[in-house]
C-alpha cells in the first residue's frame, strides 16, 4: 500500500505517524511518503505559540470538541514522559480576560483547575472586569515537528521537498491513498471557497520573568484580534492579529505596533524585553474542518483521498484527535479493499 501525505505541518506529520502506528503491523508493506514544499522551520506550525485552547464558542461540528479533548488527553499523558522536553510540551497556567461576564467554555472540564478570577486578581488587570484562570498545555510547534520527523524517519517514512500541483499528478505516480494536509494552500489542489487565510503576526521576545499566559478577548473585534502573551521554553510570544483574506506574508510595521503597544499595556514590564524574532503566518480558516474521504478517478482506476485541513488557529489544539479520525478513515479504505482488519478499538 503506497500512501502519500501532502503537507509537513503538525497535521500532516501527526496523521502520517498515526496511520503508521495503527496499521504497520497489519499491513505489509506500508510505504508512506511525505511531500511538501515547506518543512520546519518554515511551516505555519512553526509560527504558532502552541498553546492548547479551543475557540470560546462551540464548533459547528460537535466532533471537533471531541478531537480537541482527545488531543489534550493524549498530550497530558505524555507530560511526565522523558520525551516531554523534546516535544516542547509543558504545563502552563494563566488568564483569559474579558470586559464583561460570558458563559463558561465547553472545555472547562478538560483543562485543569478552571475557575473564575477573584476581585483581587482582576485588580492586576484594570482594563478588564471578568476572567478565568486555569492550567493548560503548551506544545511548541518547532520542537514537536522535529520530534515527529524523527519518529517517522525511524519508521522508514521518506520525505520529499516538492510542490505538488495536483492530486492527479500524485495518483499517476502510483499512490493508492493520498492524505491532503495542505492547510491554507488546499485550494490550490482543489477549489474550496470556504477556505481562507487568517493572517497572523507575532513577536517573540526574551522575557524569562513572564510565567503565565494572558489572553484577552474583544468580542467585537473577533478571535485573536486582541493582545495575548504566551511564554515558551526560550521566548515569549506576543500576538493579537487576525486578518481574514490577507495573503501578505511580510511582517507589517503597523501590525507590529498594534501587538507591541497592546501587550505592553497588558504587561508593562515587556517594554524592557529584547525582541528575538518576528514572524507572519496564515491560519487555514474554514467554518469547519474538512476531514473526509473522496474518491479520485484517474484513468481506469480510483485513488482514495483523505482530506484533513481547515484547522484555523487551533491545529496544535486538535491535531491528534484529527489524526486518529483520519487513521480510522484509512482503516475503512483497507477494509473495503479487503487488505486488513480494523485495528483494536482502544483508539
UniProtKB/Swiss-Prot annotation:
It is an enzyme of class 1 (oxidoreductase). Its cofactor is FAD. It comes from the Eukaryota. It catalyses: a D-alpha-amino acid + O2 + H2O = a 2-oxocarboxylate + H2O2 + NH4(+); D-alanine + O2 + H2O = pyruvate + H2O2 + NH4(+); D-cysteine + O2 + H2O = 2-oxo-3-sulfanylpropanoate + H2O2 + NH4(+); D-dopa + O2 + H2O = 3-(3,4-dihydroxyphenyl)pyruvate + H2O2 + NH4(+). Residues 1-16 are annotated as: Required for protein stability. D-dopa binds at residues 53, 283, 313. Disulfide bonds: none annotated. FAD binds at residues 8-11, 37-38, 43-45, 49-50, 163-164, 182, 283, 312-313, 315-317. Keywords: Cell projection, Cytoplasm, FAD, Flavoprotein, Oxidoreductase, Peroxisome, Phosphoprotein, S-nitrosylation, Secreted, Synapse. Gene3D superfamilies: D-Amino Acid Oxidase, subunit A, domain 2, NAD(P)-binding Rossmann-like Domain. Residues 216-228 are annotated as: Active site lid that may open upon substrate/product migration in and out of the active site and close to increase the hydrophobicity of the active site, to make the hydride transfer reaction more efficient. GO terms for molecular function: D-amino-acid oxidase activity; FAD binding; glycine oxidase activity. Interacts with BSN (via coiled region); the interaction is direct and inhibits DAO enzyme activity. This is D-amino-acid oxidase. The gene is DAO.
Amino acid at each position: 500500500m503506497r500512501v502519500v501525505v501532502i503537507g509537513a505541518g503538525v497535521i500532516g506529520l501527526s496523521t502520517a505517524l498515526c496511520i503508521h502506528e495503527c496499521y504497520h503491523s497489519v499491513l505489509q508493506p506500508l510505504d508512506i511518503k511525505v511531500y511538501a514544499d515547506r518543512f520546519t522551520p518554515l511551516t505555519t506550525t512553526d509560527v504558532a505559540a502552541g498553546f492548547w485552547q479551543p475557540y470560546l464558542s462551540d464548533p459547528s461540528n460537535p466532533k471537533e470538541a471531541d478531537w480537541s479533548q482527545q488531543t489534550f488527553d493524549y498530550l497530558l499523558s505524555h507530560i511526565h514522559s522523558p520525551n516531554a522536553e523534546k516535544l516542547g510540551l509543558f504545563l502552563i497556567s494563566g488568564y483569559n480576560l474579558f470586559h464583561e461576564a460570558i458563559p463558561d467554555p465547553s472545555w472547562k472540564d478538560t483543562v485543569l483547575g478552571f475557575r473564575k478570577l477573584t476581585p483581587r486578581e482582576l485588580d492586576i488587570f484594570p482594563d478588564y472586569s471578568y476572567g478565568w484562570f486555569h492550567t493548560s498545555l503548551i506544545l511548541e510547534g518547532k520542537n514537536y515537528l522535529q520530534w515527529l520527523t524523527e519518529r517517522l524517519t525511524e519508521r522508514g517514512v521518506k520525505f520529499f521537498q516538492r510542490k505538488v500541483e495536483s492530486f492527479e499528478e500524485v495518483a499517476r505516480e502510483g499512490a493508492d491513498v493520498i492524505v491532503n494536509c495542505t492547510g491554507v494552500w488546499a485550494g490550490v489542489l482543489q477549489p474550496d471557497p470556504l477556505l481562507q487565510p487568517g493572517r497572523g503576526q507575532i513577536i517573540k521576545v526574551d522575557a524569562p520573568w513572564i510565567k503565565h499566559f494572558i489572553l484577552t478577548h474583544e468580542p467585537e473585534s473577533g478571535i485573536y484580534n486582541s493582545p495575548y502573551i504566551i511564554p515558551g521554553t526560550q521566548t515569549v510570544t506576543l500576538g493579537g492579529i487576525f486578518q481574514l483574506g490577507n495573503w501578505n506574508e511580510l511582517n507589517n510595521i503597523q501590525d507590529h505596533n498594534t501587538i507591541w503597544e497592546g501587550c505592553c499595556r497588558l504587561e508593562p514590564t515587556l517594554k524592557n524585553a529584547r525582541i528575538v524574532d518576528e514572524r507572519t503566518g496564515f491560519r487555514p480558516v474554514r467554518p469547519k474542518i474538512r476531514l473526509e474521504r473522496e474518491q479520485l478517478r484517474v484513468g481506469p482506476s480510483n485513488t482514495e483521498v483523505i482530506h484533513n485541513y481547515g484547522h484555523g488557529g487551533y491545529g496544535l489544539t486538535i491535531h491528534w484527535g484529527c489524526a486518529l479520525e483520519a487513521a480510522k478513515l484509512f482503516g475503512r479504505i483497507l477494509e473495503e479493499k479487503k487488505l486488513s482488519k480494523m485495528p483494536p478499538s482502544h483508539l
